[in-house]
Every structure is written in C-alpha cells, then in structure tokens.
Amino acid sequence: MSQLFKSFDASEKTQLICFPFAGGYSASFRPLHAFLQGECEMLAAEPPGHGTNQTSAIEDLEELTDLYKQELNLRPDRPFVLFGHSMGGMITFRLAQKLEREGIFPQAVIISAIQPPHIQRKKVSHLPDDQFLDHIIQLGGMPAELVENKEVMSFFLPSFRSDYRALEQFELYDLAQIQSPVHVFNGLDDKKCIRDAEGWKKWAKDITFHQFDGGHMFLLSQTEEVAERIFAILNQHPIIQP
C-alpha cells in the first residue's frame, strides 16, 4: 500500500476503508481502530499534503476521489465497507458512485457528518486566518492545548484550506443513487447536518439514519459508540453481487 493509505490490520477480513475530515489524515482514525481491532482490516486515507504524505495537496474533490479509487484497486470478490467523516463523507459517497458504475459494490457505505451534495454550503476557505481558525475551532474536536496555541494551529492551516476549497468547489453531475446500503451518521448538536439529513434519501436506494450525542466532531467524542455501530454494520449486510 502506497503513502495514500495506511493499513492498521492486514487481514482477510472485511476491509473498512476510512476517509478523514478536512485537515485530517490516517492517524485521525487510530482511536476508532482501537475499538475495532481484530474485527476488520482498517485502511485509512493519508491525503496528499497531510500527515506523512508529502505530495502536493489536491484541491479538486473529483480528482482526489479518482486518485483513491485507482490506488485501492478494489475487487468485486473482496468485501469492504466505505466510511468517511465530514469531507471524507462526500468522498465516500462519490467513490461509491464510481465503483458501482463499474460493478463493484461496497458491503455498506457510511456517510458521516456531511450534508447531501445538492445542499448549498457556506464558503469559508477565503476567510482571513483568525476567522478561518475560529470556524474550525467552533466545529469542536480540537484538543484544548492545540486550540490555545494558534501558532501551532496556523501550521495546519494550508491543509485545512485545501480541503475546504475542494469541498466548496465540488459540483456533482452524476445523479445515480447508491445501490449498496447507506448509513448516515450525525451528531445531535450538528444542526445543519441534522436539518438536511433526510436529503440523503435522494441519493440512496436503501438508507438508515443514526444519531449520536455531540456536535459535528462526535467521531472524536463518541468513538466507542461509533465503533459499536460500525461493528454492527460490518456484520449486518451480506455481500452484494453485481
């Protein structure tokens, strides 16, 4: 596996392929892996320009999704589940569309903390550093010591901005519904995502909604409960045949 993905558990079990939130990278999923260890083979994306991946950041979500798809080289006979949080949720959705067009069906698609693609999003990537940082901090999930050190925070700004630009500029022209079972995860205090969650019905043939305590970054505050839901999903759905 190249620098685009990190494997936490090499095995022949179902693959759980994870895509991080804006500014995140493979290590963002280590807490989740701690609760799922031995239950699946977790592959976590290391986006260009993030973590140990020193290649140039990509500010085009379609290009980034194609890059992941090419690198994964998924097989119809190997069961896998896609999981993405926030920006990673949109990548998960788009990747599922592309794979299904080629007859490769995920066992399940888990879309977490993201509004559906037809919803207009507020653009923030152009904001001055202080305002942009404030927006990121308000989403929650940032360690207090990191929030208090704006010099350290500013070090991560370029990767955050690149990710936000990719999401803000994304335009979807593929209207295909996902045929695989879709699970939508949201935090109860994430008002925008909760408000627009039903909109995902437009994009999925079979959809289930899950709610967790917390806000947009409930993945970090409710990790054990998220892991329990994912474990149930891993064991719930049979492998879909094309």
UniProtKB/Swiss-Prot annotation:
Active site per the UniProt annotation: S86
Keyword Mitochondrion applies: no
Enzyme class: hydrolase
Keywords carried by this UniProt record: Antibiotic biosynthesis, Cytoplasm, Hydrolase, Sporulation, Stress response
Covalent S-S links between cysteines: none
Pathway where this protein functions: Antibiotic biosynthesis; surfactin biosynthesis
Broad class of the protein's primary localization: cytoplasm
Name of the protein this chain belongs to: Surfactin synthase thioesterase subunit
Gene it is expressed from: srfAD
